[in-house]
């Protein structure tokens, strides 16, 4: 039916994800078998676009099994799916209570989000873009229950949510659901009405609202924008850059190319093939001088800087304009995304630390924006005196952003305003680049000593984004909330994750070289910055700081979950544990963690893990609790 109507379908893998599938390997093996069997049967169907390998694994079970182990299990399913059907897209439908459970190898980030406030929804979408890293963001579920909120309120919410998803550059959104008739756990659910159709098949007002919805782009600031590209010996690169700029959808902009003393005929190439470009020829002067010369030649109210190895997206300017409309920011920028690698060395460089990255203080306010994707008002640029000429190859953007902040001006981040940025083509070229970055950081250290530690490392107030999805890793600190019941469970990592190796070049050679580069890169930069070479770094602690003593299970025939058992224990003097701890309750030296397993029937099983010098007391108390429940 979907094929007949020109529709694409995302399938969902049905398996026992609501159980401790790591302790019951048969459940996880059955999931692998079901995925393989399903892909063999319908994987080539023209209407199948992709597969969700899981959907909202319960947060208490994730804590019970271990967040990192669950993430790895989800990644195994995705890897299996990709190996059997590489033409399909694979993802995991996550939700805010396990925000940290993002698989590294998914093709896109998917979140089920149910928020009733437009401002809260928009704010959370901005956050999800940062969790997604370089990947597209899909809202895999959004809806509102008309039984509790009313038909008109449902229509209103679905309308603004669809517009918000468009404004904030999601790759798509799935509305839940088409009909009020739906099943869960083998039974029809009769007390929720999320559908666009009621139980008789009649259309609700929400369907009419969506049918008449005309999505529109957010209003942008008027005025001429000047795109400035500086190049030196970039003849092989700049053609693709200028072709991408020429194809941009915005019409009110000009392009200035500054040739910084090229010896390979770059300027002549630009003049011949791109006559619409304003070309400035300089003697070799350095990157900062070239950028300042471009700004002097430009006529626009806003100056947009990018590099000759970048290819701006078609909506680049269109997405930047609204950020300047309210005069909230003096400068804005967006991500610089590496294209798919063409060789194994490009794949290693793409996954290595040290690439130009934005630094964010929160979901919108930036501390640093790389010069390859930096837009600044002419007023702010002239107030700062442009770029500092002493920075000839790198570091100019860091210095410029720091001076903007020191002057009390604000920098904003726009997730949808991205440029494709080719990384260095070889490992040797990449390491030479890192040496250059280290030299630039030495200049920054001399000019901004207060922004560096005593050891010579930059003291960023915000987080440096590495391009990978924000996910649980060794040493992660997860803010579970009291007894693991926080609705939004955020994560704090010692470092934000990098991109993974591209699947096409994921080999032993690539992994070996990536490990070598990960050792060399920070040490080369540190040596060039302050002549300090660190061989070993302190390792982060594991998630489990206290080893458990034992485990057992309790039956709950009436279907009561862990909350009932925890409440009874609290009446016996047990207290909620720390909000970032993997334990629910504590009493003296005792600790307890619980999770709920549910099947298709009405009953449940409570999983209990405990720690303490005399665990029999905990066991006795829990047995008493079981009888009372």
Q: Residues of each region from the PLM?
A:
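Extracellular glycoside hydrolase catalytic/binding regions
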Residues: 63, 69-167
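Short, acidic, metal-binding catalytic loop of nucleotide-sugar glycosyltransferases
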Residues: 243-252
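Glycine-rich, basic loop-to-helix element that forms the pyrophosphate-binding segment
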Residues: 282-298, 360, 372
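Short aromatic/hydrophobic "clamp" motif used to bind/position activated sugar donors
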Residues: 303
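Conserved donor NDP-sugar-binding/catalytic core segment of glycosyltransferases
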Residues: 315-346
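Short, flexible, basic/aromatic active-site loop/helix in glycosyltransferases
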Residues: 334-335, 349-367
